[in-house]
Amino acid sequence: MFEQEAWQPSAPIKTLFTRAKIIREIRKFFTERGLLEVETPVLSEFGVTDVHLSTFNTEFIAPIGENSKTLWLMTSPEYHMKRLLAAGSGAIFQICRVFRNEEAGSRHNPEFTMLEWYRPHFDMYRLINEVDDLLQQILDCEPAESFSYQFVFQQYVGLDPLSAPRAELVAKAREHHFMCDENEERDTLLEFLFSTVVEPQIGQTRPAVIYHFPASQAALAQISSEDHRVAERFEFYFKGLELANGFNELTDANEQLIRFERDNRQREKMGLPQRAIDKRLLAALEAGMPNCAGVALGVDRLLMAALNANRIEEVMAFGVNNA
């Protein structure tokens, strides 16, 4: 009667044992270093303003006499974890499910597992070293190679991403079959060229960390005090996968508000719905979040790298197509 239903798990049971073992190793790594494991909400009154992130929402049916309200599934535990930091939690980590309303593919599932941690009084470079330590322990790999965004972009694209005229970026993007006009957003061109030309060249045999992304791509990172053209942001790549994205975290509430408002203006320009700004995060920053560095790492992609898997559902009990 039901024999046509695809009920079997996406990943072999043997893989799920390996997954559990690696998650235990991750917890041990941080516990031994004195970090507090925390849990934060999956649902929030606030989504995210980031134009690159699409969120799921649901309707909370309030008791009679109270107003129902829209709640958002979290794309990251970042905002809640920063509120804990402002409250004096000290160094913290979390392994949790997060949700992004994006297409499913070989490297993407709309529901996935994220490892996120924050280190008060660490700078970007010290946190890069800790990410590298974790990867070496979990993947038994060589230490990561380290390159600035500007260096690898010049190396493989042949243009300086911080100073090249827009017309040159447009011409180079068209060489790689990107359909764009002369007024294409500069960041769109940079992101296309980086993902299409640079990413396939890095982190193939050992992890690679790229740091100092353009200031226009700072997100929630501080701008470098040494070069205002770049942000104190880094990403790790290995075996064709983006594994981790980290920042020297922005602590200025007013600057964060400016960036959120800029996101919403860009959303309006792109025909996307604007999002309510998380004022609780801004209040926490204003109250005094300590200087810190933080990073988010995709656990499923880490497992893909560990097991040489080609598709993300190969390391999950159930992918979106048979959930």
Swiss-Prot record:
Pfam families: tRNA-synt_2 (PF00152)
Covalent S-S links between cysteines: none
Acyltransferase recorded as keyword: no
GO terms (BP aspect): lysyl-tRNA aminoacylation
Keywords tagged on the record: ATP-binding, Ligase, Nucleotide-binding
Family assignment from sequence similarity: Belongs to the class-II aminoacyl-tRNA synthetase family. EpmA subfamily.
Protein's recorded name: Elongation factor P--(R)-beta-lysine ligase
Gene: epmA
